[in-house]
Amino acid sequence: MYRLLIADDEMIERKVLFKTLSQNLKGQCEIFQAENGREALEIYEKEKIQIAILDIEMPGINGIQAAERIREKDKKCCIIFLTAFDEFAYAKKAITVRALDYLLKPWDE
């Protein structure tokens, strides 16, 4: 069973993504939620997360910073950014941390 983390400071976005993934993956993964980068890193460490879906703009530690810290410890964790920022500079940063994908909000189920 995969261990997946959703980190987004917007509760509605986080809950909708959680519900969508839970329904579509039906027991194939355990899903954890974080409302900021600090909490995401704590959950990552404690739960041995394999897939991290990160918003970029979060209070405190942002998604890029969280991804950088994850990469320092884990080269295999699958990192996906789900963000409203469509600027090239953010996409470039996602590439530098070897993110698997960079998806824009709003997203479709």
Where would I find each of the regions flagged by the language model?
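Switch/coupling loops of ABC transporter nucleotide-binding domains
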Residues: 2, 29, 77
